[in-house]
């Protein structure tokens, strides 16, 4: 509940009350990182928050905003053929831009993010992170604005995520998810 409330404050309120916050030049954060041990509900929390935000956006009487949920599992992006993983990253962000052009707010949720956005290595070779991480960064910061597009990453191992991904201005809201208690 604590994580949900924190994300709701940062994400839901700015989207639902844009007219007020636009006067203050507040921008919706670009990204969130949910991390914690396996089985603590990172994916479930992310889906629940985004589903709730999308529902509230569509119910808002004065708002014509709609949200679109793009769910991706990190390992599904991996491909042994040169350039295919990068192409899949481009397709995900193109889909988000297409939704944005239609007046919808896209939410990209990447589960098991450490599998594709791991720390780059200094040595040359077939390390997929050496090409996927720069592509991901280029898509997030590129010429075509991702304004009001929210990216959520979920991982068991935040220490494996490349520092370029989790720096301020990209994925800068980090939330630790703890295992559920008997309560």
Language-model-detected regions and their locations in the chain:
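Walker A/P-loop NTP-binding motif of AAA+ ATPase domains
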Residues: 1-183
